[in-house]
Amino acid sequence: ACLEGDSTTTLNGRYITMQDSCGSFSETASGPIQNLGTSAGTDCAIPAGASAGNTHSSRSGYYELNRMIEVAQSYLPENSWLRNPVISNMNINDNCNAGYNGQFVFFTSGGGCNNTGEIAGVFDHEWGHGMDDHDANPGIQSPGEGIADTYASLRLNTSCIGRNFKPIVCDGFGDACTECT
């Protein structure tokens, strides 16, 4: 369907609500295409003229988490957690971690790590903790990290979870995980 007039997005959707520590997200466009721009960097960097929350991590998180939910809904259509919005907190002023505590939490870059809200494998891993907490056996089950890694590995079709967590160039003859953590 073609849109007439203006359209506005706030990245508050049916399944994911983005909350960015850099500011609120609201972008309006005329016509059928919403171009959110390209940010010039990481953390709180935004495209020229954009709202303060139009960060790389908010845009990436909204996309990646919604894709993970779409896949899961096709396998678990009766799971109520997959049908209700979850808050995702982006650019939290800390580093080298991410988490799930009923909400998703992703940290800014620093301390030798990249922004965890800009890495598809980290989104999928943290989503895996949420799914583990809301599956047929509620609560985080042992081995929780293994379950979360499995979800990320299956979605991205890779054995290296969280690639680019550390800002280093990895080698390893096709297996970039041999020197990365």
Range-by-range predicted roles:
Residues 1-74, 78-84, 88, 92-96, ...:
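Acidic/polar low-complexity interaction segments
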Residues 72-76, 131, 135, 151-159:
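A generic secondary-structure signal for well-formed alpha-helical elements
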Residues 121-134, 145-149, 153:
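Active-site recognition of the HExxH zinc-binding catalytic motif
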Residues 142-181:
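Post-HExxH zinc-binding segment in Zn-dependent metallohydrolases
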